[in-house]
């Protein structure tokens, strides 16, 4: 993946991932940004605008009209190309792969040609200058758009940071929010808004990155929204019950993609927190834990 030109921002930067066709969650996120007086140019989405939920076209329209920055996820890549599957990277015949056949078929039938063209034109990488640091924004890994990278994957994250050609990376895809500072370099995942964080609550997650004299402060925030309506619409439209129930229970229907380190954290409530990525390169704790 070639490094693009750099967009300079003053901050704060609001980051979120995975709207997943969840209209109620996406509306709530954008309303929260307005409440905080964060301009669209200071908001970035890490991709997968469309996936599991009931309103693919309305969410695309909402995101496009909002004027925020978006990078291409695997779902955009697949829908733009009218591919046979979502390109999510699920193991063959896993529960996630079987369920994805159902929601991807629904999404593919409810996205118009103009939206496919828009998705196909999204950048795979966006580089931002914030607080004197260069941050590469992408969906999965540097060279693999659907690579699952979790907080416990220290060696894999370190290798990705070696390859990224920037001071840090902002990514998505795995569905869980976390921040790691490894050898003075940042790997940050804001989580997603279209599904809960597998913590037993229906909240979604987003983050704020704010430059300060001593570094960049990274805040993880959970937010409630009208998940009842979002789940009801999924059921009315015949989408997989496991994901509709997940919107209510806060628990994923399958944990196939999780590492052994992340599996025991299923159902453990996340609490908002913050990490300082220090200017001087000093060691920094991670969130939600120091891995």
Residues of each region from the PLM?
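N-terminal active-site segment of His-dependent metallophosphoesterases
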Residues: 1-66
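Beta-strand-turn-beta hairpins that frame and shape the catalytic cleft
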Residues: 4-14, 128-136, 182-186, 215-217
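Acidic, His/Gly-rich catalytic cores of divalent-metal-dependent hydrolytic chemistry
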Residues: 8, 181-291
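Active-site neighborhood of phospho(di)ester-bond hydrolases with catalytic His/Asp-centered motifs
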Residues: 16-17, 42-48, 69-74, 138, ...
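Active-site environment of divalent metal-dependent phosphoester hydrolases
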Residues: 20-24, 51-54, 75-81, 145, ...
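Metal-dependent catalytic neighborhoods of phosphoester/phosphodiester hydrolases
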Residues: 25, 49-66, 80-92, 148, ...
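Active-site neighborhood of divalent metal-dependent phosphoester bond hydrolases
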Residues: 66-127, 151-165
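Anionic-ligand binding region
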Residues: 154-193
């Amino acid at each position: 993946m070639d490094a693009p030109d750099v967009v300079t921002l003053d901050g704060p930067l609001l980051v979120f991932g995975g709207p997943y066709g969840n209209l109620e969650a996406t509306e709530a996120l954008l309303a929260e940004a307005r409440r905080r007086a964060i301009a669209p140019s200071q908001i970035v989405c890490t991709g997968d605008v469309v996936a599991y939920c009931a309103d693919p076209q309305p969410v695309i329209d909402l995101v496009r009209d909002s004027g925020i920055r978006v990078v291409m996820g695997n779902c955009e890549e697949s829908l733009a190309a009218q591919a046979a599957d979502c390109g999510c990277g699920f193991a063959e015949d896993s529960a996630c792969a079987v369920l994805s056949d159902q929601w991807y078929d629904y999404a593919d039938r409810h996205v118009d040609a103009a939206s496919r063209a828009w998705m196909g034109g999204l950048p795979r990488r966006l580089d931002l200058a914030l607080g004197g640091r260069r941050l590469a924004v992408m969906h999965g890994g540097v060279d693999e758009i659907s690579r699952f990278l979790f907080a416990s994957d220290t060696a894999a994250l370190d290798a990705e940071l070696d390859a990224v050609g920037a001071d840090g990376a902002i990514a998505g895809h795995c569905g869980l929010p976390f921040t790691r500072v490894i050898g003075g370099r940042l790997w940050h995942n804001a989580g997603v808004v279209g599904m809960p964080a597998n913590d037993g609550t229906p909240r979604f997650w987003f983050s704020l990155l704010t430059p300060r004299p001593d570094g960049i402060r990274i805040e993880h925030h959970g937010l409630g929204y009208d998940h009842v309506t979002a789940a009801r619409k999924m059921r009315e439209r015949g989408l997989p019950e496991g994901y509709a129930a997940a919107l209510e229970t806060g628990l994923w229907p399958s944990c196939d993609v999780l590492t052994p380190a992340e599996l025991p954290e299923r159902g453990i409530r996340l609490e908002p927190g913050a990490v300082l990525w220090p200017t001087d390169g000093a060691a920094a704790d991670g969130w939600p834990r120091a891995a």
